[in-house]
């Protein structure tokens, strides 16, 4: 379901031409080529992203990709239309922010595998959102967990600290909602494309974040990507990367939360 009927102003990348941006976006659809391999290709082709996209098998091997990745890329590339993808984003008024744009969040840029492209619905404010804290926890929240989460989220919002979370049931939804109710900012990081809100029960909350002007939905996944289980660790690293710290208000011994807090500690900001 689309949540950006009345979005903030659409803008393409400020650092790339539309043709270049189309290829950057197209690469986000290629399974097996993430931020590290994409940077490898850009380095080899001297920032000529069109050359990287259209490279032959031998050139891709010389760039450092292994055989299975090359074969997979060539198969996926054959059914891709970079210009059409960009036109769809523009039609839906999705903001596209690349790692080279000034609008790209400064904290996120510091992590080792920062997303090359962010898809955004709503409003990111680079300066204000640099003061951000992640609030995460269980989906099966207790009355005490709700109370504590509301207390912290309200205090942070009133102190002009952006609340970052993952739009999940439980702690995430409470954190987002409380921040909005307190007049603060909140960023919801998704494990799917912007057109697939998960869980669907939080579609109203997602829409409120976008339409309020108090925050944004953010994802590295292109339109149409469903919330597969493997996407959640990637989502969590973005929550971590956007945040000055992570607050777990209530959680079982849950792998996802453990990975998220461990990921934050591994960043140089936690040194």
Where are these regions (language model features)?
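Glycine-biased, small-residue-rich flexible motifs in mid-sequence functional cores and linkers
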Residues: 1-20, 98-271
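Short, small/acidic-rich helices and loops at N termini and domain boundaries
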Residues: 1-102
């Amino acid at each position: 379901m689309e949540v950006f009927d009345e979005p903030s102003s659409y803008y393409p990348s400020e650092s790339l031409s539309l043709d270049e941006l189309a290829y950057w976006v197209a690469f986000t659809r290629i399974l097996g080529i993430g931020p590290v391999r994409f940077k490898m290709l850009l380095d080899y082709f001297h920032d000529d992203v069109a050359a990287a996209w259209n490279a032959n098998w031998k050139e891709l091997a010389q760039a450092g990709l292994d055989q299975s990745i090359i074969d997979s890329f060539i198969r996926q590339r054959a059914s891709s239309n970079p210009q059409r993808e960009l036109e769809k984003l523009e039609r839906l008024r999705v903001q596209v922010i690349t790692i080279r744009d000034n609008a790209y969040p400064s904290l996120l840029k510091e992590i080792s595998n920062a997303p090359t492209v962010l898809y955004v619905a709503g409003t990111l404010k680079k300066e204000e959102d640099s003061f951000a804290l992640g609030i995460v926890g269980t989906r099966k929240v207790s009355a005490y967990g709700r109370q504590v989460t509301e207390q912290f989220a309200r205090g942070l919002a009133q102190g002009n600290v952006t609340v970052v979370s993952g739009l999940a049931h439980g702690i995430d939804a409470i954190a987002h909602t409380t921040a909005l109710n307190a007049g603060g900012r909140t960023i919801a990081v998704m494990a799917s494309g912007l057109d697939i809100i998960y869980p669907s029960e939080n579609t109203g909350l997602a829409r409120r974040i976008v339409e309020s002007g108090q925050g944004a939905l953010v994802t590295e996944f292109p339109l149409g990507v469903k919330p597969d289980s493997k996407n959640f660790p990637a989502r969590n690293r973005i929550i971590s990367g956007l945040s000055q710290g992570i607050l777990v208000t209530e959680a079982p011994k849950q792998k996802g939360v453990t990975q998220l807090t461990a990921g934050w500690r591994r960043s140089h900001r936690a040194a």
